[in-house]
Amino acid sequence: MASLMELVERVNKGEMIDPEPLEVYEESPNSAEKFLAHHAHSMIDLRRAHQHMVQCLEAIDYSDQKVLNQFVSISAFVGQADLRCGPMVKFGSCAINRREYGLGIEAIQNAVTYDLMHSGSYTRDRENCLLVAQQYERVAASIGWCNPHSSDWNHKLTRIAYVTSGLSDDDSTGRMIGSLARQYDSNRFKLNVYSTECGVRRERQSFAQNTYGIPSSKRGKDTLEMLNRMKVTAWMTPLDGETIAAAKALADQLVRDQIDVILFDCTQADSIAALCAMWDVARAKVNLCRRTPMYSSGLQCICYFDQGRFENDREFWSRRGVDSKYILEGVDLEETITAAPNRSAYGIPESAVVMTSSGSDLDRTMSDEFCDTLINILRSHPQSIYLCVGEGELSAQKRKFESAGVGKRVGYAGKRKDLPGFLRMADLYLAEFPSCDPAGVLQAMSVERPVVAMRWGEAPEQSAGSAFAGPEATISGRDSTTYIERVSKLIREPGSRKQLGKSMRERVEQQFAFTQTTRHLEQLCEQILQGRTGGSSDQMITEGSEPLAEVA
């Protein structure tokens, strides 16, 4: 007979076991055993109820919002959040069939936002994303918005609209907007910035969202002030109407401003941007893809900032006749970098050697191989400390560090708005393997932090970090022993750390500055327009998936 802890562990892993063995422990005089047995039994019953709720929704063709909300609540409670997105998208699709367009797209936005926020499986499936795009396109066609003017305007300066889901001083989009505003060629282009405010609570909403963001006027106050100084117009959708009214307002504003090229820095979680991407609001439309594309048929080009995702998707876009590009998002060396934080404020001794890694998906990049290597390093160097910076639950990694006896020397800083300045507190940057977040590597290099990277393979996601850091900071092949030796050498030798850090900064200045990113984006806008307006063949985009910027 299985022990209580074995049964509880199986239930926690999501197994649907027979609850009969738990009944023995439910009558135990030991209060702890009684609690665990009843809790495990209740989780089994809830999972069964969850399955019945799915069948209930299917029986009524996903038409009852109250039942859907009950299903969502149970999904969250039993830890099966991955299963909530599909039924919610089906609910939205059925609402669209009933011509309840606002309810439909807001339900779909809720589902996609949650899935992306929790790195769910639904949006990792391209077929699901195409289904979502199809629903947005149905609404865009049914609403009946049309451009009362011809979009074939011709200006001396090419007018570029940067459309984002929200302005924030502490995220990558906000930093990119600020960098573009400082570095774009104002003699050839005119830049306008638009925020859909899709995540902000509106006065009229048909379907509540999971969470609501702060309006850009508050969250992006510094960015808006900077744009005003740079004479870049910023416009935000009004919040006094519902989602469809906001989409129409944005479309009307884009037409009034006679925009030539729109850069949508958005995902499918932005229903307002998805509708505008389908309407004739500009001469050309480009999706800047950080995570997943918008998959809208109204786009002329998908521009990736992640080379691995670009390589995975390029054949798909080629088959659909859509241009796809990869552009490196460099580091803005003109951006004001905050001073290094005081170590004592974080309980870190001044004599400690601080190692760090940064990323937007640490659960994925902090692999078992990397954690085992890190444990070896921490055991060999008692004065060393490791600091995780970025997003991720890291529950499995925390258990691994605790069981290895180094848990007290591993810190978790979470998502920081003061990057890359926060990385100055570290002495050494460790690029995770097999894959890492290349943005973290570049940020560390920009503040003169020495980097150690491993080229795990030739795939872009396994070699991006080493490609940025260069051969001087790279371990060739899957050699954890050499990686540990290199890190140990840098821990022991402050002079070597300082020298390598300077060379990292020089490498960024020479090859990975944001100035190059700006020039490539300007080039992309010109090529897209020339391709649409019949420019000369040598200037047109003739190869659908050719990267504009290669990593040296």
Task: Annotate the PLM regions.
Residues 2-29, 35-40, 50, 57-58, ...:
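N-terminal subdomain of nucleotide-sugar transferases
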Residues 171-183, 319-404, 412:
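Conserved catalytic-core segment of nucleotide-activated headgroup transferases in glycan assembly
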Residues 239-247, 391-395, 407-423, 436-437:
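Conserved active-site histidine-acidic residue motif and adjacent donor-binding/catalytic loop
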Residues 251-252, 256, 415-426, 442, ...:
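Short acidic alpha-helix that forms the nucleotide-activated donor recognition element
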Residues 257-261, 424-437, 449:
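Acidic donor-binding loop of glycosyltransferase active sites
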Residues 341, 492-530:
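A charged, aromatic-enriched C-terminal amphipathic alpha-helix characteristic of glycosyltransferases
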Residues 432-494, 498, 507:
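Catalytic binding pocket for nucleotide-activated donors in carbohydrate/polymer assembly enzymes
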Residues 514-552:
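C-terminal alpha-helical cap of glycosyltransferases
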